[in-house]
């Protein structure tokens, strides 16, 4: 950070209020944001940490429909749960509000109207699916159908969750409404678009030239989007849950949630600081920092800055230190499959151990690549680092002081070379910590803080005061004085990371007033004669039985998912026998098979069909290596019209069966038959 700012505004991605918060959210966004905010406050810097719940959009409307309640009831329930969970973990928001608040509705509406009146939107008419039975337009998640890539018949109108392909609703085969189950029809509808292409030259200069210091994963994703060329993006949609578009002729339309949600940062600041919010959002002396996950990079680095620039009076983000994803026990976290460690459950099952989770998530943070959380690693880091290094040193320093000096800080005598080296080592921690925290390297910063405890342990091991107590109490006094100064330094260094443990440590040191960051590295934090509190265990060892219970909990979830997946899908509606006879299903021999360039999921087949041969593209690359299928016989539908996939004309569909775990298995004849044989 070359430029000096007077204040820092820190925002965190708004969690979606249709479910609880899990460890992936925490590791990606909220723990690092809280560490940074606590660090700045400890340094005496003027900063705000802004948070809130994202409460509009299709998933919330769908959840309400499934539960037979209103969307407002859904968001009320989860907003309170999320807010309590954050408080329980010590996420120190200056405000945690919500996008259903009156002030947010007004702020988002005014923002839209400002851009509308300035002519910053373009109006476009497009075709969108409409449910004639329900008499409403269908947003992408209100439509399901068959994925054209992997044949999953439960793909949504925006994405197939089986193969991960992004889709448009019109890509789906046999689309149907999730509301009525009927086949929707295409109807024209008008929407407003933010012309991102208009802002592309500015964004290229601002990001690619002006922010080369951004994290490589953030900069790289932005560059990729800019290199592909930006397209206009709809800011409205046909939906009955959200903030109504505030212009005439927009009945039944609401602000798209991606446009609505980031304005929540502004409205939440207005709610907190009604008289001074503009200082935080419109002053060039304010530094704006967005903490987000990688799925929000484009919105916060390209779309939201384009919105702010179009409005004209707001500052732009100075940094967006986005993290990658955290996996769980080797598998992607999934809320729909309940494959997660939920924060509210953790707080109930591990009372008083908030800092253990904060420590593990920071030590294993997915800062530049996806990382994995395992319960065995959680246990090992607690037992081998927090207990054996940090807690062990603090306990020895305090217990020995109580034993030899009745719990009072002993005088510091003449320093030896060992003392001087130790002082020099722990004094250097401050600068190392500042460098890592200022550049958003929280994992490395935590290592530097823990290094301070390692310095203390080594010092006690080298000096062995328990042996010197028999012959040289003056030397013991100096050793324990320095050990206590290191202990007090640990309370400062760990406050951003482990606030509960730092507060407990301050209590054991009998110090009510917290030390400022500027005193980190000092050797006079605790004056001679200061009486310490009673020593307690700062951390407790986690037994195997505790961890085994958590692993079993996940195993039970996995078994439940497999059981649910094994239930056969409902039988489709009857069709006429004549319609079935129209399908020409044949057996072909695979002559060639290769991956399609720039398409992770697609394989290109050259098939001997007993005639002139044909090319078929199939979305099974994640389930087979190409060489596995060469020479094998497969079943395929031969009379589908050709369809281009990634520029390759596909002349049919290879038939596969989907297993309970989502894997695909190509259907093959039990014994070899002549190429081109029909399936009867």
UniProtKB/Swiss-Prot annotation:
EC number assigned by the record: 6.1.1.10
Transmembrane stretches, start-end: none
Top-rank taxon, per record: Bacteria
Alphabetically ordered keywords of this record: Aminoacyl-tRNA synthetase, ATP-binding, Cytoplasm, Ligase, Metal-binding, Nucleotide-binding, Protein biosynthesis, RNA-binding, tRNA-binding, Zinc
GO annotation, cellular component aspect: cytosol
Short motif 'KMSKS' region, span: 332-336
InterPro entries, sorted: aa-tRNA-synth_I_CS, Anticodon_Met, Met-tRNA-synth_bsu_C, Met-tRNA_ligase_1, Met-tRNA_synth, Methionyl/Leucyl_tRNA_Synth, MetRS_core, MetRS_Zn
UniProt GO molecular function: ATP binding; metal ion binding; methionine-tRNA ligase activity; tRNA binding
Cofactor dependency: Zn(2+)
A biological process from GO: methionyl-tRNA aminoacylation
Main subcellular location: cytoplasm
Family: Belongs to the class-I aminoacyl-tRNA synthetase family. MetG type 1 subfamily.
Function comment: Is required not only for elongation of protein synthesis but also for the initiation of all mRNA translation through initiator tRNA(fMet) aminoacylation.
NCBIfam families per UniProt: metG, metG_C_term, PRK00133.1
Name of the protein: Methionine--tRNA ligase
Encoding gene (name): metG
């Amino acid at each position: 950070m070359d430029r000096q700012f007077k204040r820092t505004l820190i925002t965190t991605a708004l969690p979606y209020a249709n479910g609880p918060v899990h460890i992936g959210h925490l590791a990606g966004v909220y723990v690092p944001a809280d560490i940074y905010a606590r660090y700045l406050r400890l340094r005496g810097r003027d900063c705000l940490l802004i948070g809130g719940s994202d409460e509009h959009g299709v998933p919330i409307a769908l959840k309400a429909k499934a539960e037979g309640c209103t969307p407002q009831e859904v968001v009320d329930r989860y907003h309170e749960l999320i807010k309590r969970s954050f408080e329980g973990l010590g996420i120190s928001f200056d405000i945690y509000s919500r996008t259903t608040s009156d002030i947010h509705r007004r702020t988002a509406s005014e923002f839209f109207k400002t851009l509308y009146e300035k002519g910053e939107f373009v109006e476009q008419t497009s075709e969108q699916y409409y449910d004639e039975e329900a008499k409403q337009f269908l947003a992408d998640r209100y439509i399901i159908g068959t994925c054209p890539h992997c044949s999953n018949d439960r793909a949504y109108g925006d994405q197939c969750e089986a193969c991960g392909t992004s889709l448009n609703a019109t890509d789906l085969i046999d689309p149907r409404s999730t509301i009525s189950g009927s086949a929707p029809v295409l109807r024209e509808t008008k929407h407003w678009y933010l012309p991102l292409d208009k802002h592309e030259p500015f964004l290229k200069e601002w990001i690619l030239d002006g922010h080369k210091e951004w994290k490589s994963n953030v900069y790289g994703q932005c560059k990729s989007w800019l290199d592909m060329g930006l397209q206009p993006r709809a800011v409205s949609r046909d939906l009955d849950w959200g903030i109504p578009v505030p212009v005439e002729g927009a009945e039944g339309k609401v602000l798209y949630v991606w446009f609505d949600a980031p304005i929540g940062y502004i409205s939440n600041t207005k709610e907190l600081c009604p008289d001074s919010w503009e200082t935080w959002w419109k002053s060039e002396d304010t530094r704006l920092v967005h903490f987000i996950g990688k799925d929000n990079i484009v919105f916060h680095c390209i779309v939201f800055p384009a919105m702010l620039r179009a409005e004209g009076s707001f500052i732009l983000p100075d940094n967006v230190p986005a993290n990658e994803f955290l996996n769980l026990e080797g598998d992607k976290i999934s809320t729909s499959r309940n494959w997660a460690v939920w924060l509210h459950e953790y707080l109930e099952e591990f009372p008083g151990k908030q800092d253990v989770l904060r420590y593990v998530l920071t030590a294993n943070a997915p800062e530049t690549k996806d990382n994995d959380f395992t319960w065995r690693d959680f246990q090992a880091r607690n037992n081998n680092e927090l207990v054996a290094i940090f807690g062990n040193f603090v306990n020895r320093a305090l217990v020995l002081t109580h034993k030899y000096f009745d719990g009072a800080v002993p005088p510091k005598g003449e320093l030896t070379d060992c003392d001087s080296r130790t002082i020099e080592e722990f004094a250097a921690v401050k600068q190392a910590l500042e460098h890592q925290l200022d550049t958003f390297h929280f994992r490395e910063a935590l290592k530097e803080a823990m290094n301070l405890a390692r310095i203390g342990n080594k010092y006690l091991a080298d000096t062995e005061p328990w042996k010197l107590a028999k012959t040289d109490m003056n030397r013991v006094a100096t050793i324990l004085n320095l050990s206590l100064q290191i202990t007090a330094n640990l309370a400062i260094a760990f406050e951003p990371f482990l606030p509960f443990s730092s507060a407990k440590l301050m209590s054991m040191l009998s110090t009510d007033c917290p030390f400022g960051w500027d005193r980190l590295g000092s050797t006079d934090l605790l004056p001679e004669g200061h009486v310490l509190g009673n020593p307690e265990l700062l951390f407790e060892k986690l037994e195997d039985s505790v961890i085994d219970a958590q692993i079993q909990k996940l195993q039970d979830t996995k078994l439940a998912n497999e059981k649910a997946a094994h239930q056969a899908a409902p039988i489709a509606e009857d069709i006429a026998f004549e319609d079935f006879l129209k399908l020409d299903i044949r057996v072909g021999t695979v002559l060639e098979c290769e991956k399609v360039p720039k398409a992770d999921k697609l394989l290109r087949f050259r098939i001997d069909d007993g005639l002139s041969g044909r090319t078929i593209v199939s979305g099974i690359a994640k389930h087979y290596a190409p060489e596995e299928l060469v020479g094998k016989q497969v079943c395929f539908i031969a009379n589908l019209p050709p369809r281009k996939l990634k520029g390759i004309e596909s002349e049919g569909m290879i038939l596969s069966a989907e297993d309970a775990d989502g894997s695909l298995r190509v259907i093959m004849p039990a014994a070899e038959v002549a190429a081109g044989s029909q399936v009867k």
